From Swiss-Prot:
This is Aspartate 1-decarboxylase. GO terms for cellular component: cytosol. Belongs to the PanD family. It comes from Psychrobacter arcticus (strain DSM 17307 / VKM B-2377 / 273-4). Its cofactor is pyruvate. GO terms for molecular function: aspartate 1-decarboxylase activity. The active site is at residues 25, 58. Heterooctamer of four alpha and four beta subunits. Transmembrane segments: none annotated.
Length: 126
């Protein structure tokens, strides 16, 4: 049996661009893309913390060090500039792989620089 598990995420990135007439995708600063382990053209889910919208598109590389998070094409309707988003990719693992795999978690500052990285999501407490 294959399990669909979190592969990586960019947590609390901010939308810097929305390009309605650009070919659909999400442009992600190349440094963030690499650090998270995202691949160009990889399917990503985006969760807009600001407005609650959730949608899927694919990742493309934006200029490294630019801090760009650009929602392109139809995805541009899903957020306003400055909205906080979580960008996730998932992968299929067999049960053995799933028991040892640790996702790459990248936590972003307000300017989309790296605040922290981790491989474990803390236990939620009351």
């Amino acid at each position: 049996m294959l399990l669909n598990m979190l592969k990586c995420k960019l947590h609390r990135a901010r939308v810097t661009h929305a390009e309605l007439h650009y070919e659909g995708s999400c442009g992600i600063d190349g440094d963030l893309l690499d650090l998270a382990g995202l691949r160009e053209n990889e399917s990503i889910d985006i969760y807009n913390v600001t407005n609650g919208k959730r949608f899927r598109t694919y990742a493309i590389r934006a200029e490294a060090g630019s801090g760009i998070i650009s929602l392109n094409g139809a995805a541009a309707h899903m957020a306003d500039l400055g909205d906080i988003v979580i960008i996730c990719a998932y992968a299929h693992f067999d049960e053995v792989e799933a028991s040892t795999y640790q996702p790459r978690l990248v936590y972003c500052n307000e300017d989309n620089t790296v605040k922290d990285t981790a491989n474990i999501i803390p236990v939620q407490v009351a």
